[in-house]
């Protein structure tokens, strides 16, 4: 399994808009991609820093997404991202979770 990690900063006062856009627009795009296994997004309360990870069954499928839909996703986030996101693809070496629950979104 492979992980695409994207880290970026949000523009001021866009936390709620980011959450809406991610849930309404981006998750459906990811879900339609071949080999997509899941997504986890991290943010520190009160911070502009966000780390979004997507899980892929193979490097090939992660790369296909990168060439096919990633730029469209960046366009969807253009109103909330400040600067250029940093992207890295890595292999999952170990995982202990099967299911996780997410925290309720907190207004920034």
Annotate each predicted stretch with a short phrase.
Residues 3-8, 38-66:
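Short, well-ordered beta-strand segments in beta-rich or mixed alpha/beta enzyme
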């Amino acid at each position: 399994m492979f992980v695409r990690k994207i880290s970026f900063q949000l523009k001021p006062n866009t936390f709620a808009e980011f959450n809406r856009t991610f849930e309404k627009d981006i998750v459906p795009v990811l879900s339609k991609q071949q080999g997509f296994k899941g997504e986890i997004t991290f943010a520190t309360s009160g911070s502009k820093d966000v780390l979004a990870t997507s899980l892929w069954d193979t490097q090939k499928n992660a790369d296909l997404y990168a060439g096919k839909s990633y730029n469209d996703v960046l366009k969807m986030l253009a109103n909330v991202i400040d600067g250029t996101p940093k992207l890295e693809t890595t292999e999952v070496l170990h995982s202990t979770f099967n299911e996780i629950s997410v925290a309720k979104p907190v207004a920034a």
